């Protein structure tokens, strides 16, 4: 029995080594096939993501030390910081996929994501000041440091620490985020221009010299890229809606939770409908996308006009920004979706399979 157990462990270790070696071999082979411009592009993405993850992780850690924020319902900034970290992994995945398939449309999509995150990172800085104001109003404190220190026994050490220490510690890192994204975007844009020359022939080689078919294929690739970007933004905005709901909004909480699997299902059907040129399925998902417009508008308006608008005071700037970006993306997805459906049954299907 002992030898059996030992043999199983040795077999598991051997399998792990073989799998790891195979993964490294594939990675090495992948890097060898890339031109220098693409390697520089990937390097910039990796360095950028590492810096953002480190900075955001530090900021989240500082917020998590103040339990009072969660009790007061104003811990919205850590949620947006966490979404930023997930955005880094998403960007890295999209970059590797774009480079491996030599897809210049996805490269351009990456640049668009950077612009959106750049705007979002600027809003994060102003949101910190808003959270401070809401914290002070809910704890009935003053922003005067002398008053805070004199009343520290009444207000609580945790509140004093948040007002005096946390913003001072994390603000430089929040300011660094748009700087990193801005510099990286400029570098990536310059590299993408060079990659366009190398990858520009991919569509021509796949489709041939027929101009109309190439344009149809280009529209198809734009739509597929949009759907991939939609995955992050659609799910991200829904998660934010869930996290900031009041505790007594049970029905709305359940309905918002149900939007998550519905979003995944609709996006999956979108991929299938456009690749199989299924008009009925395409119109079905388009209908759901159109329904998403009033849904997002309702969520935005509700934060500013409902009787519980004070509950959203510390997070409405970030959620509004993310919602507007998602809404614009949704409108663009609908428009390109109709353009794709117009190209059905015109010989493009064989190139999309």
From Swiss-Prot:
Family: Belongs to the UPF0658 family.
Organism of provenance: Schizosaccharomyces pombe (strain 972 / ATCC 24843) (Fission yeast)
Membrane topology: Multi-pass membrane protein
Keyword Hydrolase: no
TM stretches of this protein: 39-59, 76-96, 103-123, 172-192, 226-246, 249-269, 281-301, 318-338
GO CC term, one of those recorded: Golgi membrane
Entry keywords, A to Z: Golgi apparatus, Membrane, Transmembrane, Transmembrane helix
Keyword Transmembrane annotated: yes
Domain of life: Eukaryota
Protein name: UPF0658 Golgi apparatus membrane protein C23H3.04
Compartmental location: Golgi apparatus membrane
InterPro entries: UPF0658_Golgi (IPR040410)
């Amino acid at each position: 029995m002992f030898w059996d157990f030992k043999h199983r462990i040795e077999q598991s270790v051997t399998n792990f080594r073989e799998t790891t070696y195979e993964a490294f071999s594939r990675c090495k082979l992948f890097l060898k096939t890339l031109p220098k411009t693409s390697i520089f592009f990937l390097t910039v993405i990796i360095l950028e993501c590492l810096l953002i993850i480190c900075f955001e992780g530090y900021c989240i850690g500082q917020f998590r030390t103040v339990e009072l924020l969660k009790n007061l319902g104003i811990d919205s900034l850590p949620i947006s910081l966490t979404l930023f970290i997930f955005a880094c992994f998403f960007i890295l995945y999209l970059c590797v996929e774009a480079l491996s398939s030599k897809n210049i449309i996805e490269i351009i999509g990456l640049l668009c994501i950077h612009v959106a995150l750049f705007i979002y990172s600027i809003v994060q800085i102003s949101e910190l000041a808003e959270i401070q104001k809401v914290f002070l109003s809910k704890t009935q404190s003053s922003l005067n440091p002398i008053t805070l220190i004199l009343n520290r026994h009444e207000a609580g050490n945790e509140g004093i620490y948040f007002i005096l220490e946390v913003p001072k510690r994390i603000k430089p890192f929040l300011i660094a985020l748009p700087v990193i994204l801005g510099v990286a975007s400029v570098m990536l844009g310059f590299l993408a221009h060079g990659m366009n020359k190398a990858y520009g022939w991919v569509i021509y080689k796949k489709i041939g010299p027929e101009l109309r078919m190439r344009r149809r294929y280009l529209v198809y690739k734009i739509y597929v890229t949009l759907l991939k970007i939609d995955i992050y933004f659609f799910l991200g905005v829904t998660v934010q809606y869930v996290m900031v709901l009041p505790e007594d909004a049970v029905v709305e909480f359940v309905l918002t939770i149900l939007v998550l699997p519905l979003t995944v299902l609709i996006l999956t059907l979108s991929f299938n409908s456009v690749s199989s040129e299924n008009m009925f399925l395409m119109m079905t998902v388009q209908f759901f996308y159109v329904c998403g417009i009033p849904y997002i508008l309702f969520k935005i308006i509700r934060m500013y006009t409902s009787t519980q608008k004070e509950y959203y005071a510390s997070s409405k700037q970030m959620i509004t920004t993310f919602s507007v970006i998602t809404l614009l993306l949704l409108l663009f997805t609908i428009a390109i979706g109709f353009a794709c459906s117009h190209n059905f049954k015109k010989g493009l299907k064989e190139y999309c399979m």
